[in-house]
């Protein structure tokens, strides 16, 4: 079965059934309707923290711009591995006119063990420096080969500088100090490589992440990190920072919607990215219906503190309600008959950002979309495990039929302790799902389309009434 063809047909048919929403008044500077978002990388891509953030943003912000999200990350991968699977796993997903590629690789190429005290004691500084320099040259050569293969096969290739290795956090995991300095050098290599090719653009993830991480640790303590406890894999906070770097780099849409009402003149002064109807000024209350063209971006509790370091809500999550000409006092805001907040006349005159109000029905809907994006992330990561197992065992498994492959992995599974939870779960998933690989692949575009359906904005009734 041609899995890619089958999944594309499913995605297209489901996307065509999307309901009509408010007129969208903004667009992406990087994606177009019908694009494939092909994310290539190692476990940081495969595990999906930043891919989750990107997917959630684009589906909530531009729910009428259908993007086919494809996770092409593999745990443990490096430049050599990407080159090996280029023809079989990567390029078949790309389309020269309809795809935007993302490439981030380097964490494993940096060979973190080179920065351990044990390695330094064993080799001595001169020999170790020579080894690191040689390895850097290998990375430059292979990264160039990868870029030269992908760039001609996609409309745009976005090259990330490698995400940070947290070498400044005071946490239990052994610190291979110097790894992130090497990743910075890798980033310079990437930028130099990109200069030569017109359709390759760079996002300096490492700079943004280490800047925010440094501010976080300076203000909240060295035991804080936007990376996971292993110093390598970003959790949602890290993915959130990566999203912010992406949005800044491409000047992506800032607004959910804007509504400006002049209460004194009883007029709608402005509406952006929303359709306003049934505006009334009766019995001391202001009421109207709003159908927005977007949803607010739902920020996980674990990452809310990061807004102070990035100003994400101010810059990229603006759902503004501004009402001037009100009498001084306090006002209750109701949406669909439920109180969602209390604001002063001054706050309303200045404009309140409802995207940060977790009580609104729009935010609740966005949280539902996010949960579905998490489900997509999990399914994609599990599916990528099948490819990862076969890539890591290719010298043996390439010679086997499907039953032989399953038997081989079953032996690996039986030898793997549950304490090694990642490989235990990966082998288990492989054994249970290898014969259903096509079905598992087909589930992803179906879910992708379902998420877009869940993200279609709904009309809501607003009512503002003076309370004191």
Question: What are these model-predicted stretches?
Answer:
Residues 1-6:
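Positively charged n-region of N-terminal signal peptides that target proteins for export
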Residues 31-32, 52-68, 77-468:
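Alpha-helical cap/lid subdomain in secreted, periplasmic
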Residues 7-17:
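Bacterial N-terminal signal peptides
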Residues 35-49, 75-79, 110:
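Catalytic nucleophile-elbow at a beta strand-turn-alpha helix junction centered on a G-D-S/GDSL motif
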Residues 39-40, 71, 159:
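A structural signal for the hydrophobic beta-strands that form the central parallel beta-sheet
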Residues 20-24:
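Boundary at the C-terminal end of the N-terminal hydrophobic targeting segment
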């Amino acid at each position: 079965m041609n899995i890619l063809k089958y999944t594309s047909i499913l995605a297209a048919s489901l996307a065509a059934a999307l309901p009509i929403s408010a007129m969208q008044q903004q667009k992406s500077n990087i994606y177009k309707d019908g694009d494939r978002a092909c994310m290539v990388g190692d476990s940081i891509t495969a595990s999906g923290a930043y891919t989750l953030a990107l997917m959630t943003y684009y589906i909530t912000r531009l729910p009428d711009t259908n993007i086919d999200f494809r996770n092409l990350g593999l745990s443990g991968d490096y430049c050599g591995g990407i080159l090996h699977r280029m023809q079989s796993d990567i390029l078949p997903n790309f389309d020269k006119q309809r795809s935007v590629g993302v490439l981030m690789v380097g964490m494993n190429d940096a060979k973190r063990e080179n920065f351990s005290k044990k390695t330094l004691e064993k080799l001595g500084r001169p020999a170790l420096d020579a080894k690191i320099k040689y390895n850097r040259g290998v990375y430059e050569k292979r990264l160039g080969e990868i870029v030269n293969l992908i760039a001609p096969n996609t409309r745009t290739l976005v090259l990330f500088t490698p995400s940070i290795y947290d070498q400044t956090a005071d946490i239990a995991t052994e610190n291979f100090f110097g790894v992130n300095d090497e990743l910075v050098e890798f980033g310079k290599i990437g930028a130099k490589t990109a200069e030569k090719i017109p359709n390759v653009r760079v996002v300096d993830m490492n700079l943004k992440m280490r800047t925010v991480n440094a501010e976080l640790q300076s203000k909240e303590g060295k035991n804080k990190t936007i990376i996971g406890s292993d110093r390598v894999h970003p959790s949602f906070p890290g993915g959130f920072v990566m999203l912010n770097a992406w949005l800044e780099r491409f000047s992506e849409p800032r607004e959910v919607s804007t509504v400006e009402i002049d209460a004194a003149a009883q007029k709608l002064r402005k509406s952006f990215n929303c359709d306003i109807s049934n505006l009334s000024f009766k019995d001391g209350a202001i009421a109207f219906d709003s159908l927005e063209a977007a949803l607010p971006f739902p920020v996980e509790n674990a990452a809310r503190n990061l807004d102070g370091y990035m100003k994400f809500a101010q810059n990229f999550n603006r759902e503004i309600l501004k009402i001037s000409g009100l009498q001084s006092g306090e006002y209750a805001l109701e949406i669909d008959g439920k109180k969602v907040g209390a604001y002063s006349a001054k706050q309303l005159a200045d404009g309140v950002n409802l995207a940060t109000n977790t009580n609104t029905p729009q935010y609740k809907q966005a949280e539902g979309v996010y949960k579905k994006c998490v489900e997509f992330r999990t399914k994609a990561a599990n599916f990528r495990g099948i490819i990862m197992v076969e890539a890591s065992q290719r010298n043996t498994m390439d010679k086997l039929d499907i039953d032989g492959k399953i038997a081989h992995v079953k032996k690996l599974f039986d030898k793997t302790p549950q304490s090694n939870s990642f490989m235990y779960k990966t082998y288990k998933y492989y054994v249970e799902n290898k014969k259903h690989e096509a079905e598992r692949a087909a589930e992803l575009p179906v879910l992708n389309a379902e998420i877009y359906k869940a993200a279609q904005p709904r009309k809501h009734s607003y009512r503002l009434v003076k309370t004191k």
